[in-house]
Amino acid sequence: MKRIVVKVGSHVISEENTLSFERLKNLVAFLAKLMEKYEVILVTSAAISAGHTKLDIDRKNLINKQVLAAIGQPFLISVYNELLAKFNKLGGQILLTGKDFDSRKATKHAKNAIDMMINLGILPIINENDATAIEEIVFGDNDSLSAYATHFFDADLLVILSDIDGFYDKNPSEFSDAKRLEKITHIKEEWLQATIKTGSEHGTGGIVTKLKAAKFLLEHNKKMFLASGFDLSVAKTFLLEDKQIGGTLFE
């Protein structure tokens, strides 16, 4: 069975000072369906946003972000498991940092746990350990983490569900004639200098971090699919019907 990593960004599952329970509900229903066809690993963001629903402190302060992540991570996992239970599924939490992937021993231990979870029908739910991962908390929104997870945990494909519904030849928020690129086989260096960002305070990623993730995966003969996390129809059609009706495939 093909193994995939699904990464969902903070922008998709949080809004204002709360989690978007409707989008989380739709996401989990989608994941449950995917688990019938694939070995699925979820990489989730939004621990800080989840913490902010419980404690209203300034989230721009780095130490406050650490505190919010520490509060929010167990709450976020509990929400996932409450929703997964409706499909007779269980999620297991794995907290990692970029440094864990620098150690082959740590990577192997994590992979062993993930392999066993999948064998037992459990959904591995990975998040960055934002309470300690200072570098990652500042910029990235788990895009790099999800790329590393795809490579080191032997997945074939990374699916990023984002508020960015694909890669465009120019910034679609500034140019009405911007065209979405359906397939990309090579990441141009000038693209990595782009300044197209997401429009929410709830995450730290943008198109550049996603392109860097795609570049890493292409260099390791893996694929990445970027699609909207707000409207899951594109991702559903791609993964469940093997048709591309939107998004951008990096292969």
UniProtKB/Swiss-Prot annotation:
Substrate binds at residues 45, 130, 142. One of its GO terms (molecular function) is ATP binding. ATP binds at residues 7, 162-163, 168-173, 204-210. It is found in: Cytoplasm. GO terms for biological process: L-proline biosynthetic process. Pfam families: AA_kinase. It comes from the Bacteria. One of its GO terms (cellular component) is cytosol. The keyword Cytoplasm applies. Its EC number is 2.7.2.11. Belongs to the glutamate 5-kinase family. NCBIfam families: proB (TIGR01027). HAMAP family: ProB. This is Glutamate 5-kinase. The gene is proB.
